């Protein structure tokens, strides 16, 4: 495994990777738009993370647990039948899957949950809170809290609880208390708002394990850095598998943690295209989508400035996606920055396109991806016809689809 601490040493000499600024900004995005009562906790967290990365004992423990508990490194798998499906005379691309679905708990989320739990212990916090949409971050957080004997409270929207009943049971089985959020749209945005309110009230004893590269600084940086192991492994595995860096990286984007984990170690590699895929829901020209980068404008949500879905009066609009994990009206500030400087590209696919992709990948590869991940797979329909010969594509297979079986069963005629 690539040592996490080496990544921080390398970052010092690279303008792209030397983000965020000391003020927690990615260009104009990011920052700390929070009540004064939270500022000491954010400063404490930033210092704890900075000190931890310099502490060999912390890094060694993290890497040991990633290997023996999480099951890293995850494979880079050549999807041969999916490759054959998209090959034509003009497109001879190969498709590779970074198998984050094979992690303990079934998704990439545990990379960050584990790292932040170790930080919480380092700071002397015994109570952990988290938000969750699809339930995967909630399960990952409940899992690491069980591992370390920490009290765990998970906030989840009532609508998402209906869609993800299996993950709700898993969280409870792991000893977590699941608090139902009924305000607003009763989805991820509202669960996040409730978690922040809890943190404001209990900041002395509680650490908030935020699940995406969103929120106030230093969360976007911390979550990114714990997930960067995805891209670090992929970079090494690509060289081993086909002798070079990939041509294209592809990942779904809601808040954006799995994509940033894959993208970050490649940002300075200008030959590698970075493509994020958002949820178009019923279509980006309807009022039922979650395509924040595609259709959003600059605003402030959950303590950070970024692109978000809002009306002409600056009120945050409802997001919609068949995927609970992409059903969020904001996006991480670093994604907004990468889009602005032209380093990353972003597109969107509809619910129907994602469902069709999930079915296709399941039938061709024997891998049932999460609905979130299926959005990245669906982009192949638009991407592959535009490519030159011998293009190497790496898709972040960010999670498995067990949690989505009920939703898929009610939507697909199988």
Curated annotation (Swiss-Prot):
Ranges where the record places region Disordered: 1-23
Biological pathway: Amino-acid biosynthesis; L-tryptophan biosynthesis; L-tryptophan from chorismate: step 5/5
Single GO MF descriptor: tryptophan synthase activity
Pfam families documented for this protein: PALP
Any Gene Ontology CC annotation: cytoplasm
Cofactor(s) recorded in Swiss-Prot or TrEMBL: pyridoxal 5'-phosphate
E.C. numbers: 4.2.1.20
Domain of life (superkingdom): Bacteria
Catalytic activity: (1S,2R)-1-C-(indol-3-yl)glycerol 3-phosphate + L-serine = D-glyceraldehyde 3-phosphate + L-tryptophan + H2O
Residues with N6-(pyridoxal phosphate)lysine modification: 109
Intrachain disulfide bonds: none
Keywords of this entry: Amino-acid biosynthesis, Aromatic amino acid biosynthesis, Lyase, Pyridoxal phosphate, Tryptophan biosynthesis
PROSITE patterns referenced in this protein's UniProt entry, alphabetically: TRP_SYNTHASE_BETA
Ranges of compositional bias, category Basic and acidic residues: 1-12
Enzyme class: lyase
InterPro entries (alphabetical): Trp_synth_b_CS (IPR006653), Trp_synth_beta (IPR006654), Trp_synth_beta/beta-like (IPR023026), TrpB-like_PALP (IPR001926), TrpB-like_PALP_sf (IPR036052)
Quaternary state and interactors: Tetramer of two alpha and two beta chains.
Similarity comment text for this entry: Belongs to the TrpB family.
Function: The beta subunit is responsible for the synthesis of L-tryptophan from indole and L-serine.
Designated name of the protein: Tryptophan synthase beta chain
Organism: Prochlorococcus marinus (strain MIT 9515)
């Amino acid at each position: 495994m690539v040592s996490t601490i080496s990544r921080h040493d390398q970052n010092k000499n690279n303008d792209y990777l030397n983000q965020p600024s000391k003020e927690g900004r990615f260009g104009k995005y990011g920052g700390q738009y929070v009540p004064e009562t939270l500022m000491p906790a954010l400063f404490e967290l930033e210092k704890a993370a900075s000190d931890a990365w310099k502490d060999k004992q912390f890094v060694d423990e993290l890497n040991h647990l990633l290997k023996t508990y999480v099951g890293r490194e995850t494979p880079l798998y050549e999807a041969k039948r999916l490759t054959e499906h998209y090959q034509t005379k003009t497109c001879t691309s190969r498709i590779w899957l970074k198998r984050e679905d094979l992690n303990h708990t079934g998704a990439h989320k545990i990379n960050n949950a584990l790292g932040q739990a170790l930080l919480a212990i380092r700071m002397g916090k015994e109570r952990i809170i988290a938000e969750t949409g699809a339930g995967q971050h909630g399960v990952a957080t409940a899992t690491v809290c069980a591992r370390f004997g920490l009290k765990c409270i998970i906030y989840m929207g009532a609508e998402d609880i209906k869609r993800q009943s299996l993950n709700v049971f898993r969280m409870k089985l792991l000893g977590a208390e699941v608090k139902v959020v009924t305000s607003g749209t009763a989805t991820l945005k509202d669960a996040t708002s409730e978690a922040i309110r809890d943190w404001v009230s209990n900041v002395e004893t509680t650490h908030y394990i935020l699940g995406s590269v969103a929120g106030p600084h230093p969360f976007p940086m911390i979550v990114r850095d714990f997930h960067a192991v995805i891209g670090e492994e992929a970079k090494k595995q690509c060289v081993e598998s086909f002798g070079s860096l990939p041509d294209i990286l592809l990942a779904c984007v809601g808040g954006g943690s799995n994509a940033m984990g894959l993208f970050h170690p490649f940002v300075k590699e200008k030959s590698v295209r970075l493509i994020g895929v958002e949820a178009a829901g019923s279509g980006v020209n309807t009022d039922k989508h979650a395509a924040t980068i595609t259709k959003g404008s600059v605003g402030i949500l959950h303590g950070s400035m970024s692109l978000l879905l809002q009306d002409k009066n600056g009120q945050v609009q409802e997001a919609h996606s068949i995927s609970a994990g992409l059903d969020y009206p904001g996006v991480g500030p670093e994604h907004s920055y990468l889009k602005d400087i032209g380093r990353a590209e972003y597109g969107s696919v509809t619910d129907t396109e994602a469902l069709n992709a999930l079915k296709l990948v399941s039938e061709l590869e024997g891998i049932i991806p999460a609905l979130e991940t299926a959005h990245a797979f669906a982009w192949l329909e638009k991407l592959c016809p535009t490519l030159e010969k011998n293009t190497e594509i790496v898709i972040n297979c960010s999670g498995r689809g067990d949690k989505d079986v009920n939703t898929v069963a009610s939507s697909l005629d199988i």
